Every structure is written in C-alpha cells, then in structure tokens.
Amino acid sequence: MQDTTLHIRHLGKQDYESVWHAMQHYTDTRNSESPDELWIVEHPPVFTQGQAGKSEHILNAGDIPVIQVDRGGQVTYHGPGQLVVYPLIDIKRSKIGVRQLVTHIEQSIINMLAKYDIQAYAKADAPGVYVNERKIASLGLRIRRGCSFHGLALNVDMDLAPFRRINPCGYAGLEMVQSKALGGPQTVTEAGEQLTITFSQLLGYQHLVHHQGLAAS
C-alpha cells in the first residue's frame, strides 16, 4: 500500500556532488518503510554528463566543471536561477513503472506552467518539457533497488549562455527558454512551491511534510 505522505526537503544552494552522493546514500540505505522524499535545490554552475553522454556534446566547458554521473541521458547544465528537483520515490511500493514516473514528472511541470497560461508539452522521443520547440525543463533519472533518484531541472531566471557550450541532452542547436521570460514563475522559490503542489497531486500524495536541509545521516 502506498504511503500518501511526501517529505519535501528544501536544500537551498548546495554543490552538486554532495547532493548527488546524499541521494545515492538515501537510495542505498532506505527500506520498505522509508518515506518518499522530494529534494528541492539550486546548484552552482556545473555540467553533468549522464550515462549515455558523449564527450563530443561538450563543445567548450571552459571554467565550468564537468561531472560524470550515474543518471540516464546526456549532458546538461545546472546553475543559479534554475530549480532542481530530485524525487526519491519507491516506485516498486507505489506500483508505478519508470516510464510512468517520467510522464508524471513531465506532466507536473506542464500542469504547473498551465497555471500561468503557458502551453508546454512533452516529446515522446526527447524527455523533458518544451514551449514552442524550446526546452524549459530537462529530465534524467536513475532507478536502483526499485527506487528513483536524480530528477528534473526547470529553467526559471538564469544565465542561459552556458547551454551554448554544450549540445543540451545531445541535441545540437537546441534552444533553451526560462519561465520568467514567459510570464511564469519569477523565482526558484515560487517555482518550487508550485511544482511541489502539481507533483504531489499527480502522484497521489495527500500529506506534505516540509524540512530544511538534509536529514542527519
């Protein structure tokens, strides 16, 4: 039976690697009673290269570090002004498949943007969320021990220039867009609050418990 409680962890601004390793640790040590969690964070500038990533898609990293990680997908960029959300969900317990979880994540972004009269959509062959053929959110997951980690990145109010140093998600010339320019959420905090609502509604969580920072390990 699915626990209908979702724990929301507000991590503020944190470096990528420490949060990544904390996600791995939570996933590796959780059991059938461990709660599902949603981690909300903002990272300093970093390129992350997924398991399908090819080095030729990093055109000119410059002074921005590149980290090889254990999620699906190819290269993407994280930076200030971008909302990053990591759903740590026991999909085995929740009885949902990986594809269904991806669809739920994409739809939660689409539903959130619809509140601002922004018509966003997903693409079957290219995970993420798009507005007028420009990408507003990227997505990459890893499933281990029947549980998800990694997640989504929504462009809110950031410098989009570093995306031009890569082929985002392996697509040359893919244009990026952000919510502030479209009349959507103006801050990462606002976007996080709204996305938490649409995500929890779609996955059937009825009780949200908020925490500041990571749990003591």
UniProtKB/Swiss-Prot annotation:
GO terms for cellular component: cytoplasm. The active site is at residue 169. Coiled coil: none annotated. It catalyses: octanoyl-[ACP] + L-lysyl-[protein] = N(6)-octanoyl-L-lysyl-[protein] + holo-[ACP] + H(+). Pathway: Protein modification; protein lipoylation via endogenous pathway; protein N(6)-(lipoyl)lysine from octanoyl-[acyl-carrier-protein]: step 1/2. It is found in: Cytoplasm. It comes from the Bacteria. InterPro entries: aa-tRNA-synth_II/BPL/LPL (IPR045864), BPL_LPL_catalytic (IPR004143), Octanoyltransferase (IPR000544), Octanoyltransferase_CS (IPR020605). Residues 32-207 form the BPL/LPL catalytic domain. The keyword Transferase applies. The record marks 135 as: Lowers pKa of active site Cys. Substrate binds at residues 71-78, 138-140, 151-153. Its EC number is 2.3.1.181. HAMAP family: LipB. Belongs to the LipB family. Catalyzes the transfer of endogenously produced octanoic acid from octanoyl-acyl-carrier-protein onto the lipoyl domains of lipoate-dependent enzymes. Lipoyl-ACP can also act as a substrate although octanoyl-ACP is likely to be the physiological substrate. This is Octanoyltransferase. It comes from Shewanella sp. (strain W3-18-1). The gene is lipB.
